[in-house]
Amino acid sequence: MKKEIAVHELRYSNTNTYLIEGSRGMILFDTGWAGTFRAFCSAMGKLDIPVQKIDFILISHFHPDHMGIAQEIADKGPEIVVMDVQKDYVHAADSVFAKENNDAFISIDDDKVRYVRIEDSRDFLGTIGIDGEIISTPGHSDDSISMWLDSGELFVGDLNPLYELELHKGTQIEKSWNRLLELKPRIVYYGHAKNVDLNSEVPSIKVTDLHKLVARIMKYIDKGVSLDRIQRKTGADETFIEDVTRMYLTHSNIDVQGILDRIEIKGR
């Protein structure tokens, strides 16, 4: 009898990262910011799983908060997997760590990376006993990918959460989500937002509710509440909160609708 897929959420940084156990191996979906390796090892220790037991590391997109410790983990044995649509972006975040003089960052070793074509992703995942595929889902970034498991789990990285879809009509974000929703996912695992069980939760909210959410975020900003606390209080996606904050602080006398309009333009 085939072993059931197990999904472990590793809580050690501001990025949600996931360890997925197949019947013949394990794959890590995303990592954290450079400097979080010890915290990552501690999270693995709580699962009683050695880092060396991870077979592959898959990065949803090569922004610094998702690939920051990928090479550090790979140096312990796991292999970094880069999809063909991502090959030109592997070092996109190197300059970010250089500017902040982050000595903890180790650049990805190109000679040790395994490149996989999107069309071969099902065969690749099959090598570790996972039935599923890796899908190109641009929107948040051009190199964004999502991982779909036939058992209903969907890992999307920083693809804008479903509750924001009203803001992104006619955009690449909507196109990517439409493709994913055709698969009828059961659970969506986000890079920053709370995971969503689509069998029990409404995947999107009305525009009027978005207005209320933005107004609430604006009030917290006025009170000097940190972005982390705003996220905890509202449950909103980190990127969405950052977008609202940026629009609010850089546009004088802007109202809620003005912020939503600008976020929609940004998503095109």
Predicted regions and their residues:
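Accessory terminal helices/loops
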Residues: N178-I187, K194-R268
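Conserved beta-strand hairpin/beta-sheet module of binuclear metal-dependent hydrolase folds
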Residues: M1-L47, I145-L159
